[in-house]
Amino acid sequence: MNYKKIIVGFALSLACLSVQQAGAETFSKSKKKENVTAATSINWADASGKVSYSINATTAPVVKIALRMFSNDMKAVTGNEAKEKFGANIQIYQLNQLTNKEFSAVEKLGAPLHKFITAKDAFYIGTRKGKIIVIGSDARGTAYAIMELSRMAGVSPMAGWNDLKPQTRQNLSTQVGTEKIEIPRIEFRGLALNGSKWMNQKNYSQLARLMLRLRANTLWQVDGKHEAAYNKAVVDSFDICIAENYKVTEITGKKHKKKHKKTLENVKMICAGNQMQLENVSPALVLEMLNNRDYLETKSEHREKSHRSEMHHDEDCAWIANVTNPKMVSLQLAMISDLAWNGEALQGGISSYLQNWLSSLFGNVAAKKIKPLMEEYYRLTSIRQPAFMAMPYGDTEFHSGEFGNELERYLYAYDLLKTKTVNLERTLPADQRDGFFEIVKYPIFSAALIAEKELEAQEARDIARPGLFPNDDEAKASAAVSLNAFNTLKQLNAYYLKLGKGKWSSIIATDGAEMQAPQLPGTLSSKDIKLLMQDAFDRNQDLQPLVTFSKHITAKNAYDWTNAFQAPAAKDGTAEKIQLKPLLGHSNNAVKLPKGAILRYRFVSSSIGDARFTLATIPSYLPNEKNMRVSVSIDGAEPVICQMKEDYNSKEWKMNHWRGQALKSFYVTLLDGYHTVEIKALDDNIIVDQWVLDFDVDREYYVFPVTR
């Protein structure tokens, strides 16, 4: 290729926005010409009604793979595969493989090459001279552009990964004047798969295809581990970068045979710790991690996260998600990928993003019905993640003797959610049932069954006296419910393993501690289980309204404030605002409280005497966080300073993350009447979830009894 023409092109565009500036923030837009009086569209299909495309003579292997995937997508959408055809309405170009003649033709189209030609992985899609023009700056950029065509046709990047088919469409077209340029905000975007038992050569191709659709370009190796050498043939054909010890290796050159190594400085290792694996972290907390500029690793600190180097005020070099159970983190992976490309991808908030993501998979009507199910699922799992229910994490503080049996009340919430899930499943078309099972039903049912298995086993252990289990009907009834949940969980997993002729059997994880048999004080036969189930606690009949048990206690979600006072403006005239954080915390709507901001609550109580005040915040996820202090003043008294941070990886830190809350308590003496509670953030990264004022100072419970 003759690069003189490119140089001429750059000379003509020196006054334009530089690619480096565009790359500092994802540039992604669609615009329509205002002076078009009668908007027209360009059809994707040719005269025969089949989608067709043309492409330059020489392309990289990953581009050819993307074209095959696009062709299959078009068959799913229109009923016919897309075919290469001279003069097609869709014209595709890989810039770094063009001949002089091809490049000259592209220049004449008038596409804004200067905005993306030197950016890695970038692409352009627009209309020119009655054609849909698709241009990639390099091999990956071209492949991503082709996958973007699939997305524009209604094929979600996560559809195939979750056995969902796109909505069929008779006609596909693009409006004249449409123009889109996308440049990744984060240069290296990918996954760390180290220690993943499911990762093998058989699954590499599926994983690489998922990465291509998500526009992820990097596999990360940690501590010298080489997972099957990352299957060199697949890695090379999909143009995937390999990163190890903060160095990334790229294959470059026109013939794609040169290796180039680059040192990475600022890296977000997302959920890399054993205590915070991606599938055990709320999507809302993942979003907090992505948006927090202090959540990163640097080469010089080597696995120590701290404040960004003074030399690096730019975007992170890499975002790497540590994945141990890829079938359970579809939403998180989609979110990470979209935000790595476009800093405004979640500007509407995670709740809106969840709605749009579900719509891309199930359609708008079904998505509106599914969203409340997922919101309740995230609330219940934020109270206790399934992985942290089982041993070796120990017994939880769920107490059957408080608030009319809070243990059974929590399980009843899961019962209601399961019923709603089954009822919705019946209304879905057959071709959405498998996808619904994988994205919605399996996570909900497995979490519910694990909770029931472990909490009822805990109850049986608490009730049974040593050596007397065979004669203790109450303990045996709880044990029977636990074993019944375990048997149902095994059936659920067996169904998943057979789904799609076993296509996911080597990927989904069914051997974790949370999947194992419950630890019980004795054994029961199948016949015993069936009989004892009849005498078990009846959640439909035996549970009374929570408000019945709320005497002498006031519990509130942080978002239920009476007044809120923003933090004083910073020296530059700006200050972070108080923000609600949907899908985060036991409240499912925690409050991010900037340093200096205040929440005030006013309430009435008829109780008199000593009381215990407990504050719950979202635990720190920054290992080098120095302070997370909150002051609490009750009725205008001297504020009590609560240090919410625990030493990283300490027992207290782990217990906070297992619970999903950091707790701090102190005691006060109050009269009856109206009271005020004032909560003020004294440091950054404070996210307040709930608080409780209990006049029964010795009462033990797990879930704050919020009645509103």
Q: Where does each model-flagged region fall?
A:
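Intrinsic-disorder/low-complexity accessory segments
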Residues: 91-154, 206, 210, 214, ...
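Contiguous, structured surface segment used for ligand recognition
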Residues: 25-183
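Extracytoplasmic
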Residues: 138, 524-708
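Aromatic-lined carbohydrate-binding surfaces of glycoside hydrolases
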Residues: 56-59, 78, 82, 87, ...
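Bacterial N-terminal signal peptides
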Residues: 9-18
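Substrate-binding groove of N-acetylhexosamine-processing glycoside hydrolases
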Residues: 177, 254, 261, 265, ...
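Bacterial N-terminal signal peptides that target proteins for export
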Residues: 1-8
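Boundary at the C-terminal end of the N-terminal hydrophobic targeting segment
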Residues: 19-24
